[in-house]
């Protein structure tokens, strides 16, 4: 896989979202990430395995980027993650899914600010506004939804964010590439404006 990725000019920097309560599986996950020369794994460690996960992170030189799936995930809000990693290595941090925060009634700007310097990667997106009678807010083309993509990018710039963006677009499954291209175009335009 690494050879094929390299042949195509692609560098695989991370994997996930990894979830397991089996300590041996965590060792194998870190081994895989190390063998593939990845920088981080995206995961949701059980609260009672943090000592092992931190130890494996140090052993293999792999960062841990914790995803915030909606409730009942232990990490659905930033305070929970910050409590779990308090006093631990700076290589343990957040894979901030900005859409899930909003879907849970949290303000994504506040969450990004709260996690200052502990964000390793992002599942970045824009989502449709809440609609009466609908529980789920669909992913939409960046800049057309309710998340203030440009504002989030400004917060990340203020924080000196140096991690990774994963474009997460879980909509229009049969023809999503044109929508993703529009997301990239919006990102480039917004980033250019912010950097002026």
Model regions: which residues?
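Histidine-acidic metal/acid-base catalytic patches
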Residues: 23, 34, 78, 82-96, ...
């Amino acid at each position: 896989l690494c050879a094929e990725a390299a042949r195509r000019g692609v560098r695989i920097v991370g994997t996930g979202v990894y979830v397991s309560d089996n300590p041996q599986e965590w060792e194998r996950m870190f081994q895989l990430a190390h063998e593939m020369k990845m920088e981080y794994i995206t995961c949701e460690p059980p609260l009672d395995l943090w000592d092992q996960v931190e130890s494996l992170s140090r052993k293999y030189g792999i960062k841990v980027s914790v995803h915030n799936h909606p409730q009942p995930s232990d990490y659905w809000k930033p305070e929970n993650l910050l409590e779990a990693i308090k006093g631990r290595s700076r290589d343990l941090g957040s894979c901030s899914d900005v859409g899930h925060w909003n879907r849970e009634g949290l303000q994504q700007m506040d969450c990004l600010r709260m996690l200052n310097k502990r964000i390793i990667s992002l599942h970045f997106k824009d989502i449709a506004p809440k609609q009466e009678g609908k529980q789920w807010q669909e992913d939409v083309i960046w800049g057309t939804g309710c998340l203030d993509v440009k504002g989030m990018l400004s917060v990340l710039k203020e924080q000196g964010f140096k991690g990774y963006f994963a474009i997460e677009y879980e909509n229009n499954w049969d023809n999503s590439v044109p929508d993703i291209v529009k997301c990239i175009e919006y990102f480039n335009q917004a980033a250019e404006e912010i950097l002026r």
